[in-house]
Amino acid sequence: MYKRQGIAEADTEYGPVRGFLLRNIYSFRGIPYGDDTGGKNRFMPPQPPHAWQEIRPAVAFGASSPQPFYDRRPESYSMFVDHWNYDLMGEDCLRLNIWTPGLADGKRRPVLVWLHGGGFTQGNGIEQDSYDGENIARYGDIVFCSVNHRLGALGFSDLAGAGGEKYRHSGNAGMLDIVAAVKWIQANIANFGGDPSNVTVMGQSGGGSKVCLLCAMPAAKGLFHKAVALSGNTVKANNADYAERLGNAILHEAGLDTSQVDSLQSVPWEQYLELANRARQRMAAEDPG
């Protein structure tokens, strides 16, 4: 593995990064494509990352979006088939990973953007060993990217009914993260040996549904050129009425009224996920249909 100066270095619009070279594949892990989503950025559209001047290490996978964690260790066969890698969880989770066979070698390789499964509530870009892009980059001679984005109640709480215009994107923040990631790829992937005019988005299960939603989002128009949805598709998720009622139920569960929506931005994420889960359970009990 090579990591000395000048090896596995690439420029991005926000600053230079240094990954590593292993078995002739360049790997870059945990590159920020957006700012920390905590605090005042919670429920908001993704913001650009802060620029940096010095070479930034890109050798460790970024944090996963906060999510419920289920201990699978006692289930030996489940662990054998699905080796789940959650690692750190936190709201500074807008990170992507890149594997490429070449840097600044004059080639324009196809780009494959992988969207993980997990039903919009769980997962990350490297949760399973098969999501590691080294081999597909090598044997396909492509640039492979995987993405972390907001999930569950932090990515899809519709608070616009209570919070008004400020929160109008809160119910779709997680998908807007993915749009921001593909925009970043469009702007920067040429520096990693990729062709921004040949980008495919691909996902499995919940990731397949995300692919279908991207195809329907005006904000994603022109950012990719092919799409592959594996064992998952989406025509419609929750309707607007349900989403708004759930947002109001979360406020009620937190003991807040509509004038206090901003207070939800300062609730620890662990507590917020629990509030949202209780609100969802209460709504289901009140209206089981």
PLM features: residue spans?
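Surface-exposed acidic, glycine-flexible loop patches that form ligand/cofactor-binding
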Residues: T100-K107, A187-D195, P218-K221
